[in-house]
């Protein structure tokens, strides 16, 4: 991938400003809107926030890890930065579209790259009904919550909640309960990326529920609809010897 214009995005309060300044001295950079590649310096959180902010530009993102985990990032190598981008592989991610309705009847929409999650707002467990493609699949799930994860997000919150890791090209979604109380032995479901999942919240007054799309949170929700978007996509760049597919496979074997 040949590039001439790069943009740099980083947290100006980062403790790694010395490294960031070194990168700025080594490479010419331009305004974000003029870039051929947007380089996000930091961790997964910094990357996700800026993907949400700039995905409408349809410019590829390259994450440079200065955080802790950095699952969606590339290892720091200031000297070979442009070479690594030239030789990088592209992963195409389709975000989830979440539509929620709250107790006032207000409807909100948000995109999620990793997962959509719904969870109890108080000490009372949540109760909700689950429909898939308009068909009731579970009349009542009693749990702390539930989530729908993309393949890219399946190794994040979904994995911590006991859900499976999905291969990036699987065209599937994870539906995973969070601390399920009833049915106690239900561990979730694997669904097609073309499926539409709907959660109807039960006993809302006593058991209020919130919903999030990645880091965007909505309060006092009555229903949530989740589906994958095909008309929106994100291009993430990864070093040729450090692809997202390889990382997902390694994660399944505990590497």
UniProtKB/Swiss-Prot annotation:
Keywords from the named record:
ATP-binding, Cytoplasm, Kinase, NAD, NADP, Nucleotide-binding, Transferase
Per UniProt, the enzyme's principal EC class comes to transferase
| Catalytic activity reported | NAD(+) + ATP = ADP + NADP(+) + H(+)
Q: Which domain of life is it from?
A: Bacteria
| UniProt-listed Gene3D superfamilies | Probable inorganic polyphosphate/atp-NAD kinase, domain 1, Probable inorganic polyphosphate/atp-NAD kinase, domain 2
The protein's role, per its UniProt record: Involved in the regulation of the intracellular balance of NAD and NADP, and is a key enzyme in the biosynthesis of NADP. Catalyzes specifically the phosphorylation on 2'-hydroxyl of the adenosine moiety of NAD to yield NADP.
Q: State the name under which the record lists this protein.
A: NAD kinase
- What lineage is on file? Bacteria, Pseudomonadati, Pseudomonadota, Alphaproteobacteria, Rickettsiales
